[in-house]
From Swiss-Prot:
The active site is at 177 (proton acceptor). Glycans are attached at residues 97, 271. Belongs to the peptidase M20A family. It comes from Aspergillus clavatus (strain ATCC 1007 / CBS 513.65 / DSM 816 / NCTC 3887 / NRRL 1 / QM 1276 / 107). Disulfide bonds: none annotated. One of its GO terms (cellular component) is extracellular region. Residues 1-17 form the signal peptide. One of its GO terms (biological process) is proteolysis. Transmembrane segments: none annotated. It holds the Pfam family M20_dimer. Zn(2+) 2 binds at residue 145. Zn(2+) 1 binds at residues 145, 178. This is Probable carboxypeptidase ACLA_013260.
Amino acid sequence: MKFPWLLLVKGAASVAAQKPLATSGSGQVLGTFNLEDIINASPLLSFHRDIVKIPSTTDNEYEVGQFIGDFLEQKHFTVEKQSISDSRFNVYAYQGNNSLPDILVTSHIDTVPPFLPYNLDYPILGGGHEFDRQSVLIAGRGTVDAKGSVAAQIFAVLEILEEKPDASIGLLFVVGEEKGGIGMETFSKNPSPSSFHTVIFGEPTGLNLVSGHKGVIGFNIKATGRAAHSGYPWLGKNAISALLPVASFTERLGEIPFQDGGLPSSLKYGNSTVNLGVIQGGVAVNVVPDSAEAIFSVRVAAGTPDESKSIITREVNKFTKNDPNIEVAFYPGGLSPTDLDTDVEGFDIITVNYGTDVPKLAIHGGGDRVVKRYLYGPGSILVAHGEDEALTVGDLEGAVQGYRVLIEKALSRDV
């Protein structure tokens, strides 16, 4: 039996064959055809629209969590709302009493700020171009990262459960991925042995299967100076001036060969990359600044976080000649590169530079049991977090099929 929403999608595709004449200022109407008709005709696209329209920047996920939980309950899932705080919770859903599923399908429901409203558009490609429904562009914060994955995962699971009602699949949608990963860490605190033999993570991968991603560490460099009147700067010591050279040097550590003192690289992930994301200091333009700080994020291509921390500390001290007024401090934790499974045919394989919740999901017990971990999803990371975040109808619908392939492979696994 086919899902009714698949029939609606086919109906929308036939209607969409009309040739567009023009686009309005809102980007919503093409000649006599309204792009919203395509969205309204598809339960998948409508659900995606509904959750994207709900602002859910990190720490403000309550409303979208409620919406997703209610939707899954209407689809006869048992839904647990795992509390993070009074106004934040993970959504964990499964069939009946099967709270320990074999397969876990997961993504995150928080987004980075600022909220950007949902919008539809269509690229006009010139005369004679036939309307292509799959090229309709869906824009807004979270369309890609990661509400595209959330929607596609849910509808892929619904399709499979329609065909195989006894399939042992759970859905987990966590908060806080964009800021520290508290949602996945909270889910992982359950000390009971993990039941799942396969976990499918959703992030924007361009419909490619990811073989791994870099690790990450964060740190700051602080400079201490001496305040003075700006008219007599020689009476003080400018902390910003002291900080800038070492900050610039540190930013280049990923480009320096490892044997020459740089950060590690690997054939799989390439160079480690260093981002100088924040620099701050001083209190007023007429005061010599007595303090300054530079904050860095490193995407680590090889080795452990501690190894990279040692390199950074050593090279900063060497560059500053052990200046006691320049200090390096690392933020707690850090992650090594994460390798993932790619043993499913039909996908292109890539690596990515961004971090995910994958290493934050703890696997408890099980002895030598191998848990497969896959990372896949619609949309490009190159537009995620930006003002032009968007994906196409084709991306979203293609992801449903991709998730189906991954889940079907997991269901056939002999464990």
